[in-house]
């Protein structure tokens, strides 16, 4: 259970999802984009919500991404509905793909009786296939909003093994505020905010500009610190919608409870990021890398991501092999500032390298530790005060099997 004490307040994780936030309902349906599973869904807010988005840095961007960016720009950061489909990415589909994304936005706007510029459109699935709009039109018509979140959480999945949901509660101005999220992602995960989609709802009253800054920072510290296979998708997107119905005083960085709000938002994002990393295609375990002693937090994060993204480290994790040589190799090519003679490495509670000198280790004990569902790798560079984390998963035979047969 997530807990964290902040300045006189506390945020905590509770049972719930995005519909347990005031003002939000969702829907999910099957329209035939996938063989049997739900494949189209929507989030709806009773009021125009202050909204922000963070998008893939892949230069090839899917049509729905472009439409959603346009919506946010034209509405001055307001959204009231989000339409999502899985099974088709609508990426690299030319001018007709953009036409289809606009039509999806228009259909959702009509369905939920909101202006088109207050609708976001997101898609995930196979790249390069035209969107079968007859199926999509039927699916949008079949959407029925409710406070049940599971159909939506299922409708956004592709190769995921299960839904990913979280809900966090925090006190702001003596008002209970909730921040909740739902995400999908299992393969093609190396976001610089793969495919990775994240949707966060909150009933906090927060200024749009502050919400945008908070999401960007939280994304950089969480979603951008996960990797499964090194691929950055054309469709990566994280959206946050704030209904304001908690009725707190408007939040920005000058608000006395800002640290509480940001801590809760970051916790929500981190929980989703870990769920994505742990659910990497074929994965059997989550890998968390903690780096200290870097010259800056940014460099610490870079080192952590280099370690967790190393195929050799990932395969060693699968094989329960405490091969720290692969870890120090990743540190060396990470591009960070370091002294090769002052590095410490530990795998779980076991020190393997101190001041760049090998330590006599119990290989059997380390291997036993690495049987766990979550393993922690620590590195200290002794160059400064910078700290950072990253998350990933082991690399298994099943990853190849799943991706070799993705379209079959």
UniProtKB/Swiss-Prot annotation:
Family matches, as Pfam families: ArgJ
Catalytic residues as annotated in Swiss-Prot or TrEMBL: 195
Cellular component GO terms, alphabetical = cytoplasm
This chain's protein is named Arginine biosynthesis bifunctional protein ArgJ
What the entry lists under InterPro entries is as follows: Arg_biosynth_ArgJ, ArgJ-like_dom_sf, ArgJ_beta_C
Please tell me whether the keyword Cytoplasm is annotated for this protein.
yes
GO molecular-function terms, A-Z: glutamate N-acetyltransferase activity; L-glutamate N-acetyltransferase activity
The free-text function statement in the UniProt record for this protein reads: Catalyzes two activities which are involved in the cyclic version of arginine biosynthesis: the synthesis of N-acetylglutamate from glutamate and acetyl-CoA as the acetyl donor, and of ornithine by transacetylation between N(2)-acetylornithine and glutamate.
Q: Which domain of life is it from?
A: Bacteria
* Positions contributing to substrate binding: 158, 184, 195, 281, 403, 408
Name the major location.
cytoplasm
Q: Which UniProt keywords apply?
A: Acyltransferase, Amino-acid biosynthesis, Arginine biosynthesis, Autocatalytic cleavage, Cytoplasm, Multifunctional enzyme, Transferase
Into which family does the record put it? Belongs to the ArgJ family.
Localization recorded for this chain is: Cytoplasm
Q: GO annotations under biological process?
A: L-arginine biosynthetic process; ornithine biosynthetic process
- Which biological pathway? Amino-acid biosynthesis; L-arginine biosynthesis; L-ornithine and N-acetyl-L-glutamate from L-glutamate and N(2)-acetyl-L-ornithine (cyclic): step 1/1; Amino-acid biosynthesis; L-arginine biosynthesis; N(2)-acetyl-L-ornithine from L-glutamate: step 1/4
Which residues does this entry assign to the site Cleavage?
194-195
Instruction: Give the E.C. number(s).
Output: 2.3.1.35, 2.3.1.1
């Amino acid at each position: 259970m997530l807990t964290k004490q902040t300045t006189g307040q506390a945020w905590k994780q509770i049972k719930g999802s995005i519909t347990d936030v005031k003002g939000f309902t969702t829907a999910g349906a099957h329209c035939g984009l996938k063989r049997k599973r739900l494949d189209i869904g929507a989030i709806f807010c009773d009021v125009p919500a202050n909204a922000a988005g963070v998008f893939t840095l892949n230069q090839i961007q899917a049509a729905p991404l472009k439409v959603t960016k346009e919506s946010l720009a034209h509405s001055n950061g307001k959204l009231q509905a989000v339409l999502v489909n899985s099974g088709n990415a609508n990426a690299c589909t030319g001018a007709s793909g953009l036409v289809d994304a606009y039509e999806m936005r228009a259909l959702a706007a009509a369905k939920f009786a909101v202006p088109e510029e207050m609708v976001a459109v997101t898609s995930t699935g196979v790249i390069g296939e035209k969107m079968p709009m007859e199926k999509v039109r039927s699916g949008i018509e079949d959407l029925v909003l409710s406070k049940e979140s599971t159909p939506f959480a299922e409708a956004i999945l592709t190769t995921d093994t299960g839904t990913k949901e979280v809900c966090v509660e925090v006190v702001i101005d003596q008002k209970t505020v909730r921040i909740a999220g739902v995400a999908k992602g299992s393969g093609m995960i190396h976001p610089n905010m793969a495919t990775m989609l994240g949707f966060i709802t909150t009933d906090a009253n927060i200024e749009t500009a502050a919400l945008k800054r908070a999401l960007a920072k939280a994304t950089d510290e969480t979603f951008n610190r996960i990797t499964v296979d090194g691929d950055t998708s054309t469709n990566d997107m994280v959206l946050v919608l704030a209904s304001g119905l908690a009725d707190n005083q408007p939040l920005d960085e000058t608000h006395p409870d800002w640290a509480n709000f940001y801590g809760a938002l970051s916790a929500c994002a981190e929980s989703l990021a870990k769920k994505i990393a742990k659910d990497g295609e074929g994965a059997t375990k989550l890998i968390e890398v903690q780096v200290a002693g870097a010259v800056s937090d940014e460099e610490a994060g870079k080192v952590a991501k280099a370690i967790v993204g190393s195929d050799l480290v990932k395969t060693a994790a699968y094989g329960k092999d405490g091969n720290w040589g692969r870890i120090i190799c990743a540190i060396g090519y990470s591009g960070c500032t370091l002294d090769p003679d002052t590095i410490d490495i530990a795998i779980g509670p076991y020190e393997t390298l101190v001041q760049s000198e090998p330590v006599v280790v119990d290989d059997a004990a380390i291997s036993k530790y690495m049987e766990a569902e979550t393993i922690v790798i620590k590195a200290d560079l002794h160059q400064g005060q910078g700290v950072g984390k990253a998350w990933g998963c082991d690399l298994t035979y099943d990853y190849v099997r799943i991706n070799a047969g993705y379209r079959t």
